[in-house]
Amino acid sequence: MDMFLNKEDFFISCFNSKKIGDDAAIIGDWIVSKDAFFEDVHFKRKWFELDDIAYKSMIINISDSIAMNADPKYALLAVALPSSLSKPDIKKLYSGFKRAADEFGIEIIGGDTVSNIKIDITVTVLAKSKRVLRRVGLKTGDLLAYTGNLGSSKKALTSLLRYNNARKSSRFFKPELRQKFISKATSSLHCGMDISDGLFADLKKLSKANKLGFNFSNEIPKSIACSGEEYEMLVGFCPRKRKKMLRLAKAQRCELNIFAKARRKEYKLKCKAHHF
């Protein structure tokens, strides 16, 4: 297993909280998530327009709410800004935050700003859900599936690292969140999470949460399964729900790829962590 994920697991275990372990924490009626988006860790400034940096920093956090079938309501922003940024630059950042917030009906209610040599953004989203979708709940014999097409983000990242250029239509720049599908499907799903670190890496998290492994229907290329920052959904459901899931996905114009079955076996991670 990747060294960083070992350290991440160790760090999380130090807190010994039952609220940690899903895409977001459940506190009463609220679903609370936080994500960081740091320059030279998650992105390089030359890759993005400023408004796109702000937009993506919001979207990756909103994804955590949607992954738990929660409706995002409010957001808090912590933004570190270089002194070299002009007022028009800051206005561009604002427009990116607002674009994402407006898209999902979110009100930005506060936060903090500090000076820094790089752009670092941390977003907290508060959401509500009538029926929470969690990582825990997968059963032996359940089918595993992911939405959409994976691999675009890794392809774009490779191109950016080599040539400082990639198609702006790539999911690396603008992930597509599956809010409508998850809202319709949650009552028939046993578990779910978003694919942020890559399919194989996130399967490891699902395996750990449910103490199960997987039998794959076909070999999945690493170019697909090791592509992080896709923000598609990874879900598990009873085989009897197969036709219903495919029908729901089609109705929402969302491709659903069934690729494995849950089994009582060990699952070994086949990829390195996406960022580290």
Which residues does each PLM region occupy?
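Helix-biased detector of long, well-ordered alpha-helical tracts
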Residues: 1-276
